[in-house]
Amino acid sequence: MANDENTDGVNKSEKMEKMCEFIRPMVQNNPDGWGPCELPDQFKDIPYQPFSKSDRLGKISDWTGTAYQDKKFQNKYNSQFGGSGMKAYAYEHDEDETTFHLVDTTRVQKPPYQRGRFGQRNQRMRGRGGQRGGMSQMQALGKLKIHERDRRGQNKRWTRRNQAPIKMRDASVTVRPDWVTIEEMDFPRLSKLTLPGVKEGEDVLCCGAVEYYDKSYDRVNVKNEKPLQRIDRIFHTVTTTDDPVIRKLSKTEGNVYATDAILATIMCCTRSNYSWDIVIEKIGNKLFFDKRDNTEFDLLTVNETSVEPPQDDGNSLNSPRNLALEATFINHNFSQQVLKSNEPRYKFDEPNPFISEEEEGEVASVAYRYRKWDLNNGITLIARCEHDAVMQGPNNETQFLTIKALNEWDSKLANGVEWRRKLDTQRGAVLANELRNNACKLAKWTVQALLAGSDQLKFGYVSRASVRDSSKHVILETQQYKPNEFATQINLNMDNAWGILRCIIDICMNQKDGKYLIMKDPNKPMIRLYDIPDNTFESEGEEEDSDEEEQVKDAFQR
């Protein structure tokens, strides 16, 4: 038994020795670095990405990463162990989204007074730079250039962003295919023309009767306003060729014929923005400047030269056409209300040539003065001019007046000043604003007063009683100027005005006999001269909308 136990113990020890036998592993010596010299077969052709366990992985994989990274930030988030291979998987710290709040992204329009704030900042930078060394001055100068460049760019963007959308205006008359363009005259060239030395016009014939001006209206002010009344009188707007006096004078006097309104439109054309047209007939060596009947030529524009002229639709209360009808209605009623209607009129030698026996109603107070001007080189101009009233001067002399009315429709929409707040204290600011918004209309009124030889040009300030009602108005104040002084104040150069007229006359005189048309381009600063067929506009009355004609007629007969 003892032998058997010894034998079993030997066998167990042998088994234990076999189980605990140490097998020496294959050790590869890599003198050039760490790791095996050869890759096992199972690990061949597997892409290897070096990494470090301490690196913070931002993504599992990036299929949209760029092939080339920005060298400026190559060591910002990459591990020193991983090298450039971790660039695609580099962890980047994002802002904590728990502090995220929705904010109002609406752009706030900067007021105009903030435009110069960059200039003030530049001045402070310039002051600091002057106290430092040369390098600081160079840095400040560079910053000044950057701020100046940014300021210009921001001003340009501000201007484009805040400009009103440009609305294409319609032409006063449709250009037909059979019209031939003879000349295009742009405003910059016309502004350089001059005809100095034109003397005061000579009276050829005076006719009509006018009433005396009521000086009590000079005391009207904002606190003592007067309502504008409706005066039912007849106004005649006769064109040149329909004037019996001009027809008679054309046989013996002059070779160019027109009315003061037509001449003022041509002479002040460089200030106009809206489209207008004038018909010219050349018969032999004579020119007749005409307007088309029952058109908007005689309507007064409103805010034509404003930065943002009225652009409402045709049915709107403040559309350009409705505002023009309102302004014409105001002018006619104001020019008759401020007169002494109960006193005898001042009469010229000849009666009003346009009164017919068929007309019913009272004719408006108006006197016509037919005058003659010598424009040199054989050009003699005959024009019909108008006076609205007379009054006694300081020395009891008779002074002739041209009476016009400026109207306020909506100061907020017109980018203007509120008359009821400014007229009594800052009348000059109100007039300056009107000169900006209605430069063409005021210039034409001044030219008409100068052509007629009026002694005074009287303005009335008429405003709506309610902003939303264009039928009721009140007179807030009156003001008068001498035409020559007012022309200087509004920078009206009569030598240039005569030069423009003479240029157009010379071009037309060189054409063959026929009918021509001058039209202001509705969207460009230029006028064009067309050669049109002789029968043009003869059947126009049947083609045009009768409703529009009735509106224009009603504006002159109310």
Swiss-Prot record:
Molecular function terms from GO: mRNA cap binding; translation initiation factor activity
Any Pfam family hit: eIF-3_zeta
Region (Disordered): 534-558
Disulfide bonding pattern of the chain: none
Keyword Protein biosynthesis among UniProt keywords: yes
Main subcellular location of this protein, as a coarse class: cytoplasm
Region (RNA gate): 296-310
GO biological process, one term: formation of cytoplasmic translation initiation complex
InterPro entries, per database record: eIF3d (IPR007783)
GO cellular component, one term: eukaryotic 48S preinitiation complex
Keywords: Cytoplasm, Initiation factor, Protein biosynthesis, RNA-binding
Biased composition (Acidic residues): 537-551
Compartments, record wording: Cytoplasm
Domains: entry comment: The RNA gate region regulates mRNA cap recognition to prevent promiscuous mRNA-binding before assembly of eif3d into the full eukaryotic translation initiation factor 3 (eIF-3) complex.
Alphabetical list of HAMAP family matching this protein: eIF3d
Function: mRNA cap-binding component of the eukaryotic translation initiation factor 3 (eIF-3) complex, which is involved in protein synthesis of a specialized repertoire of mRNAs and, together with other initiation factors, stimulates binding of mRNA and methionyl-tRNAi to the 40S ribosome. The eIF-3 complex specifically targets and initiates translation of a subset of mRNAs involved in cell proliferation. In the eIF-3 complex, eif3d specifically recognizes and binds the 7-methylguanosine cap of a subset of mRNAs.
Family to which the UniProt record says this protein belongs: Belongs to the eIF-3 subunit D family.
Description of how the protein assembles with itself and partners: Component of the eukaryotic translation initiation factor 3 (eIF-3) complex.
Protein name, as recorded: Eukaryotic translation initiation factor 3 subunit D
